[in-house]
Amino acid sequence: MTNTRKTHPLXKIINHSFIDLPAPSNISAWWNFGSLLGLCLIIQILTGLFLAMHYTSDTMTAFSSVTHICRDVNYGWLIRYMHANGASMFFICLFLHVGRGLYYGSYTYFETWNIGIILLFTVMATAFMGYVLPWGQMSFWGATVITNLLSAIPYIGTTLVEWIWGGFSVDKATLTRFFAFHFILPFIITALVMIHLLFLHETGSNNPSGLISDSDKIPFHPYYTIKDILGILLLILTLMMLVLFSPDLLGDPDNYMPANPLSTPPHIKPEWYFLFAYAILRSIPNKLGGVLALIFSILILMLFPLLHLSKQRSMMFRPMSQCVFWILVADLLTLTWIGGQPVEHPFVIIGQLASILYFAIILLILPTVSMIENKLLKW
């Protein structure tokens, strides 16, 4: 008798995706982040659902409702901080997942890569709107500053901003629609994740060597299920350490003050995971130029498959490209640091140089180094 797992229409899909999936035998811990991102998404949807049961999206009561969740709801403080720090864990996993893709040349799977970039944009939009919901000082001013960037669009900019706001400033209408979008987007993200996996399973996983691994495949279960469980345990451990010992480590103290349109915080800055893009935005004196640089800092990821000039897929055997890659990582860390600093000397010039270096590495240095390596290997 054939196994139900292999014949039942629904169980068959799960079987081909998570149990009998042929996987390369040599994928390292860098391949764990896909499953960790799935876990993060589940945690965020569940904690978010329970928060939404007690939250009110009204300017008068939003801040108080978050306070009520933390003080009066059973384990409300735990749910709230798991959701806030879960977002940070989500972005840590996202950045490492994208970094892995860049290092090992996984971007040569066009469809999977491009869906991944759309996912990155969607998650960033969701996180931004979620940050507005507690209606603290940084929520309000962050929303004002970031939505205002759209006014840089010629001709329709101002109208567009007022349309998004639902009025002449960030107010009740803005908060209500942001809550609605923040609620629906994770489900859209879930659908996109399924498409992401669908395209991935068309080609099979890449592996550290970048070579075709069809001749040496092993079943996903039990080998990679047990490996994923280790990653999951470490992720939960890290998240709970953050939540239970220093829940406000990555937050902004200004957000514990209710939103006040009449008083601007001394330094308006987004959450840490947007600081690199914020630094690039601020490094250009022109408003429209800054907005374009901000968008292209993420969109540039779509060019990687076109800029891949090396004859080898992975960077595993390309020491020169490895050096350039780690300089890019250091540059992104520098941009993250600069994004959190005030706009004054020497931070301005450091930010500008780091921004130039970021685009130069991706568009110029990495492709050039790849060609040099080809020549050195007489390819």
UniProtKB/Swiss-Prot annotation:
Cofactor(s), names only, from the UniProt record: heme b
Alphabetical keyword list: Electron transport, Heme, Iron, Membrane, Metal-binding, Mitochondrion, Mitochondrion inner membrane, Respiratory chain, Transmembrane, Transmembrane helix, Transport, Ubiquinone
Coiled coil: none
Biological process per Gene Ontology, one example term: mitochondrial electron transport, ubiquinol to cytochrome c
Superkingdom field: Eukaryota
SUPFAM superfamilies per UniProt: a domain/subunit of cytochrome bc1 complex (Ubiquinol-cytochrome c reductase) (SSF81648), Transmembrane di-heme cytochromes (SSF81342)
Transmembrane regions: 33-53, 77-98, 113-133, 178-198, 226-246, 288-308, 320-340, 347-367
One cellular component term from this protein's GO annotations in UniProt: mitochondrial inner membrane
Principal place of residence: mitochondrion
List of residues binding heme b b562: H83, H182
Membrane topology, as annotated: Multi-pass membrane protein
A Pfam family per the record: Cytochrom_B_C
Record's subcellular location: Mitochondrion inner membrane
Molecular-function annotations in GO: metal ion binding; ubiquinol-cytochrome-c reductase activity
Residues involved in a ubiquinone binding: H201
InterPro entries listed in its UniProt record: Cyt_b/b6_C, Cyt_b/b6_C_sf, Cyt_b/b6_N, Cytb/b6-like_sf, Cytochrome_b, Cytochrome_b_C_euk/bac, Cytochrome_b_N_euk/bac, Di-haem_cyt_TM
Record-listed heme b b566 binding positions: H97, H196
Cofactor binding, note field: Binds 2 heme b groups non-covalently.
Miscellaneous remark of the record: Heme 1 (or BL or b562) is low-potential and absorbs at about 562 nm, and heme 2 (or BH or b566) is high-potential and absorbs at about 566 nm.
Function (record text): Component of the ubiquinol-cytochrome c reductase complex (complex III or cytochrome b-c1 complex) that is part of the mitochondrial respiratory chain. The b-c1 complex mediates electron transfer from ubiquinol to cytochrome c. Contributes to the generation of a proton gradient across the mitochondrial membrane that is then used for ATP synthesis.
Subunit structure, interactors included: The cytochrome bc1 complex contains 11 subunits: 3 respiratory subunits (MT-CYB, CYC1 and UQCRFS1), 2 core proteins (UQCRC1 and UQCRC2) and 6 low-molecular weight proteins (UQCRH/QCR6, UQCRB/QCR7, UQCRQ/QCR8, UQCR10/QCR9, UQCR11/QCR10 and a cleavage product of UQCRFS1). This cytochrome bc1 complex then forms a dimer.
Family: Belongs to the cytochrome b family.
Name by which UniProt lists this protein: Cytochrome b
Source species of the chain: Spermophilus citellus (European ground squirrel)
Gene name of the encoded protein: MT-CYB
